[in-house]
């Protein structure tokens, strides 16, 4: 959904409601757990957040509160949605003076702790009213060497005709999102 004005809360509720029961817009649901499917652009980015349990806990809290989307030009609406498989959200973005809402649903959660390793995160997948088609995983990892990492892994391809037409611009916006998301979690974990 594109608009010249910011969508109201009512618009957001109506948009999410219209997408809530629809199937994912791609058939390889859950593929961010394994190998990405052919025919998609794959992005894998990570940054070291620091060391220790406090850093890990702060980063986990940041993910639970959607801080990786608290970027000024991109947000999750409605804010405060719980991380649960099946939850539908909208990614709201303002780019080039236009507002957009993009529907996504949480595919799976990760909450693992084994010996001195821990990992927390989730993946969401695109729904029919999203400009892209694919899946994105956000994880925080705490390794045996005490290092803590934030990892973003995604596969996608353009779905909306305007995004297909302007795919180089869309790729730059995806790269901007990654850079800003990494910076947001770095800041939140300190």
Residue ranges and their predicted role:
Residues 1-95:
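Hydrophobic ligand-binding cavity/cleft-lining segments
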Residues 12, 16, 159-190:
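A conserved amphipathic terminal alpha-helix motif
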Residues 24, 45-47, 104, 122, ...:
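A broad, low-specificity signal marking well-ordered, structured residues that form hydrophobic/aromatic
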Residues 31, 111, 157:
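Residues that form or immediately flank small-molecule/cofactor binding pockets and catalytic motifs
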Residues 85-89, 118-124, 150-152:
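A short hydrophobic beta-strand element
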Residues 96-144:
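Hydrophobic-ligand binding "helix-grip"
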Residues 126-172:
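Beta-strand/loop substructures that line and gate deep hydrophobic ligand-binding cavities in soluble
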